């Protein structure tokens, strides 16, 4: 397995956000399934990925990658999870640079009721994380 992909799986397994500091390039761009405009930079991408880990991989979600397609410096990871009883099917499309750092992370989600649930839960989690970050 590619070292970058292995590190991504380690982040998911350990839920250790410090792994993202080494895994994400400073110029990384995150493409949300909800927000049209790309989110640019390491800090905002890290915030989104931590929120997604809590929402998609939280208790009773049964988050699982069901397929991986690896070609050169690109990984396509299909996943399933359950959020509030709604089955979510999605794809993480990840591109890394020559140093193995993630430079692009795009998430696609289906069906519509799953998108609506992801929108709701990610909005709540992002607000919660922003409030926690703002505390002394």
Model-derived regions: residue spans:
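Short acidic-aromatic low-complexity motifs
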Residues: 1-26
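Soluble or luminal CAZymes and related metallo-dependent hydrolases
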Residues: 3, 44, 86
């Amino acid at each position: 397995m590619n070292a970058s992909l292995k590190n991504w799986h380690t982040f998911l397994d350990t839920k250790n956000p410090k792994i993202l500091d080494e895994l994400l390039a400073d110029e990384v761009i995150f493409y949300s399934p909800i927000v049209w405009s790309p989110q640019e930079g390491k800090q905002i991408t890290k915030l989104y990925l931590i929120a997604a880990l809590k929402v998609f991989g939280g208790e009773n979600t049964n988050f699982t990658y069901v397929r991986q397609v690896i070609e050169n410096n690109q990984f396509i990871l299909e996943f399933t999870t359950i959020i509030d009883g709604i089955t979510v099917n999605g794809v993480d499309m990840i591109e890394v640079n020559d140093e193995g750092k993630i430079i692009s992370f795009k998430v696609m989600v289906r069906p519509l009721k799953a998108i609506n649930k992801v929108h709701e839960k990610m909005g709540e989690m992002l607000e919660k994380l922003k409030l926690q970050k703002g505390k002394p």
